[in-house]
């Protein structure tokens, strides 16, 4: 015999100021154009594991990939700059914070020629939300406050970012890959910021080096190959729109 059992479940979530805006954007499917509108007919787009066509291996493509590395490098290290400015009580802390948001917007703007302004804004907004949680983490460390809730709040925003990229380019930006890299970046941020706060110079340097590998240079001699977040980002665009990268 069975009997019906009713449970009352209460969920608590970190109240990040960007949460309601991002939720609205993710729920409103009209904000993300249909994938079919991104492909340019028979443009010979390729997937993550396919070789790029020879005609895109040119100087313009190389410069684009370097520009992407520069943009992601500025973004990922802007949180560390904020930590230095805040903990040093420097007068330009507000400007550093604004620059962090500007760097996030710049990455979104790189998508506009390929996916349109709505997608670019959505990516930039998602990165700003991830930034803001990082700033809360820095402030909590400075004030000797608990960080567990802040750390946990990063996960849904990382997942949202990965989902956005995957919807734009499912063949080259698998959600699991983007999530894996970005969560590793978040962990490296925590390690670096904590090490800096307690004066552990060696751990600080190790974390900074790992951040560079995860986001900019890639991990050399990795068994399965490990491209950086910047290279996955740029290669995905080139692979989806190869005709736009011909000489």
Where are these regions (language model features)?
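C-terminal amphipathic alpha-helix
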Residues: 6-90, 96-100, 104, 136, ...
């Amino acid at each position: 015999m069975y009997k019906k059992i009713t449970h009352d479940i209460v969920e608590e979530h970190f109240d990040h100021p960007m949460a309601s805006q991002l939720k609205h954007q993710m729920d409103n499917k009209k904000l993300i154009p249909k994938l079919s509108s991104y492909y340019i007919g028979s443009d010979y787009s390729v997937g993550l594991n396919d070789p790029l066509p020879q005609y895109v291996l040119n100087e313009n493509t190389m410069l684009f990939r370097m520009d992407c590395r520069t943009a992601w490098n500025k973004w990922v290290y802007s949180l560390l700059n904020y930590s230095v400015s805040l903990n040093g009580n420097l007068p330009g802390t507000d400007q550093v914070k604004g620059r962090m948001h500007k760097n996030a917007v710049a990455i979104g703007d790189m998508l506009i020629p390929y996916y349109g302004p709505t997608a670019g804004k959505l990516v930039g907004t998602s990165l700003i939300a991830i930034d803001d949680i990082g700033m809360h983490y820095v402030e909590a460390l400075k004030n000797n406050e608990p960080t567990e809730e802040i750390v946990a709040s990063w996960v849904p925003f990382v997942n949202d970012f990965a989902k956005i990229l995957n919807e734009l380019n499912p063949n080259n930006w698998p959600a699991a890959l983007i999530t894996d890299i970005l969560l590793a970046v978040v962990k490296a941020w925590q390690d670096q910021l904590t090490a800096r706060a307690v004066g552990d110079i060696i751990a600080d340097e190790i974390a900074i080096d790992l951040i560079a590998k995860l986001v900019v240079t890639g991990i050399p001699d990795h068994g399965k190959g490990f491209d950086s977040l910047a290279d996955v980002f740029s290669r995905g665009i080139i692979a989806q729109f190869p005709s736009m990268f011909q000489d």
